[in-house]
Amino acid sequence: MKLKWYWLGTFGFSLLLSHSAMAADTTLDEIVVQATLRSIPIADLPESVTVLDRDTVQAAGVQHFQDVLGLIPNLNWASGTSRPRYFQLRGIGEVEQYQGAPNPSVGFLIDDIDFSGVGMPATLFDTRQIEVLRGPQGTAYGANALAGLISIRTADPGTSFTLKSEITGATYGTRAAAVAVGDGSAAGDLGWRLVAQQYLSNGFREDAYLNRSSTNGLDEGTFRGKLHWKLTEALQADLTLMHVNINNGYDAWSINNTGTTYSNQPGRDAQRSDGAALRLVAAIGGIGELRSVTSVARSKIGYSFDGDWGNDVLWGPFAPYDYYQSDDRSRRTFAEDLRLIGDPSRVLFGRIRWLAGLYTLHLTESDNLRYVFNDQYSGAGSSDLDSQYSATDVALYGSLESELGARSTVSAGVRVEQREAHYADSADLQTPFPRQTNHMVGGNLSWARKTGDGEHVYVTLARGYKGGGFNIGSQILAEQRSFGPESLWSIETGFRYTRPKSPIQLQTDVFYMRRQSMQVYLSEQLQQNNPLAYVFYTQNASQGENYGLEAELTYRIDDRWRVSSSASLLRSRYLGVSGLFADLGIDGRAQPFAPSYKFSAALEYQHPVGWFARLDVTGMGSFYYYTSDSQTSSAYSVENLRAGFKHGSWTASAWVRNLFDAHYAQQGFYFGLIPPDYSNQSFLDRADPRQFGITVNYELGR
């Protein structure tokens, strides 16, 4: 608690300090948000958003989106994978997908390609901008963005030759190499860009039984191509192709909660994704602009782990006690977003700007879930579950925006969506799963006002939604085999200060969200002597609420020093629960992975000669891991440091992540594992320890 108030006090003091220095002559660049229905300067956006630009990503990150998560208010992730897949915004999101069909609450896009629920391909090299929209995106994105949206955009082709290369070496066997090359015509009619990167690391764990330090290793390759082509004065095309091959090990858990594991069958966490997106923009004279974004993606995912985290030598007289689980998954998506944007010079009734769109998404996923076991009670054996899931979403949406006088703007949007989903598996031959059809409506109503030079306030009322889904397993009762949609109402008010030629940018917001027919994820261990004998299911509870505040500040003190910081407070609760949920005693309790506070602060120095440095401090409060038990994390803070020298096209930097080697957990389980009594106890997935590294960059053009 002292840590919480210390950092919030520091943040507040920095606001006062920066306000007194607004007359400084250093300026910050304008930020444009692109993940919204139409590109818009951040000052004019009537909702909460965090934007990390190219320089911030390069200074604060090393390899993956995971490296910069701490900079974003009210964003968390559930570990249990080698890289983040499951995110929570403002306390809402998934914690895992051990069984069943995909049903994300947080949308995840990379260059217009949908990776919601499978966001491991989010490597950082050559990233141009990361945008995180908090709150329901009921008009723009619908069912996959109940809690918000994460959008990553990589560098586009330029108008001249560009070359960028990078090599990294670090402790724990880490090494990486990357190159980006591109060219384009001076007029911007034609341009291309190619990217290749490979990253390897031992992965911060030591398997004492196998005497190996790479069982939790990272092996990540990224390949991407982009083409920009202006076919005519009225038509342009942008094509993105990507291939990301992640072949990571997974051996993170230990019976004594340390970085030393004892697995005899280490797992893997692999994802091979291929994706393509084609964006066409056509000018239609007298009407406006027609935009078409077509995207396809295919991901093959292999996830496995040692179920008992041990070996027969470790278990001694209780051996054999050996479990292993693997899940081989294949996902395909096809999406089309067709949008007509009215010509700003030909507004309706002299003042109303408009747009309308049609969206469709088709997703198919097949799974092979396999359990292998050998113990004193059941002997040796295995079981398999094969499943298929498909869902088709079709949505119509539209938006109107009008000026109310010289300073105020009002906007409204609506989205009507239908989802048809079907699930079948090898265990449902006698009682097939019913086909599920959901009809959902979302939208927003916003008012914004320019209160002064560079000062904006806004109020937004929004409604989001999320489709229903399926529960699997022979232990699931017939009436529990499916669950219904969830909806969410949100009201938010905020203030932004983005005065031109000012060294300061500030944004704050306060929000309240009420969840209806809230989807709650539960798990239960069925046999104390079997660590894989679990049933996982989701049910609709009565209600929930999530409310809090968020603030971000960037202040360029002078041409050498810059300060940036963020802070968020969050309160989440289950409300009016009954039945099974009442038996769990969760009424009024916080929701999982919803820390009560989160903060970040960064100090940057840039000397005219070329020396530079950046110190980051990030942290968050404690949170519950799961609804089914009362285990919580501990509050923590982490420091990262980077310093180096830039000369011409060359940059060399030395960096340290987790500078003071903080020990904290990022995930926790509570169950019976250790013989002979198999009593329930807490097991923790420890975060990465301190790591030192050196990175050298060469860049010609941008």
Regions found by a protein language model. Give the residues of each.
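Short acidic/polar hinge/loop motifs at secondary-structure boundaries
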Residues: 97-98, 105-136
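Gram-negative outer-membrane beta-barrel transporters
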Residues: 341, 355-357, 403-410, 418, ...
